[in-house]
A protein has these predicted regions:
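Domain-scale recognition of functional cores that engage charged ligands
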Residues: 2-208
Length: 209
């Protein structure tokens, strides 16, 4: 059972959708993704994993856990906890240092810069819990050549490397858990969003050394 949709809260407007999701999960079908893997990709779960001591629950070796943490940027809740209220103040005070992310995938949903205060002051406290705050990653730009709509464009760009993972489990029994390739997305340096499907970025080819 492959989920082409179902990655946004709006995809589950009634209990019928939740019942259907749970029915697939309980069946003998292979769910892609499984409910656990689906949750692991949610922005809120990623934010929780960045909390002190959480990664260490899953990685016993302290040195390895520390190396994993070196890859993290700041991730903060936007709820009504003291940490969430502090993050809200940070975002309102210096919005250009952050990006606000909803529980959605596909590109085009993140909020940047001057739009952050507009969002945070327009949503309710309950709605704000559905977002997280992340430090804005400022990748070093470089010059490259893009082909868009059949036209050759020379531009200052930045790239984002994603690593595919293959994970198959049967309950708590992990059958396969390995790296399965990569995806390099490149976009103009002055563009905030980075989704290929949403038209913000192009698929690139890295030189692997």
């Amino acid at each position: 059972a492959y989920y082409r949709s179902g990655y946004a809260p709006t995809d589950f407007p009634t209990t019928a959708e939740w019942t259907g999701r749970w029915l697939v999960e309980k069946s003998r079908a292979i769910a892609v993704p499984s409910l656990a893997y689906h949750l692991a990709g949610c922005k809120k779960i990623q934010q929780v994993l960045a909390n002190p001591g959480v990664v260490e629950r899953f990685i016993d070796d302290a040195e390895t856990a520390a190396r994993v943490r070196e890859c993290f940027v700041g991730l903060y809740p936007l709820d009504n906890t003291s940490q969430g209220m502090q993050a809200t103040r940070m975002a309102l005070h210096e919005p250009h240092k952050y990006v606000v992310k909803p529980q959605r995938e596909g590109g085009g949903y993140n909020v940047y810069g001057d739009d952050i205060p507009k969002l945070l002051t327009s949503v309710s406290e309950e709605e704000r819990k559905g977002y997280i705050l992340m430090d804005l990653i400022r990748a070093p730009p470089f010059n490259s050549v893009l082909v868009r709509n059949g036209e050759v464009v020379v531009a200052s760009v930045v790239s984002e490397l994603g690593i595919y993972g293959i994970f198959v489990s049967d309950g708590k029994n992990v059958v396969v858990n390995k790296q399965g390739g990569h995806l390099l997305r490149t976009k103009a340096a002055d563009v905030s969003e980075g989704g290929v499907a949403a038209g913000f970025a192009v698929i690139d080819s890295p030189l692997l050394i």
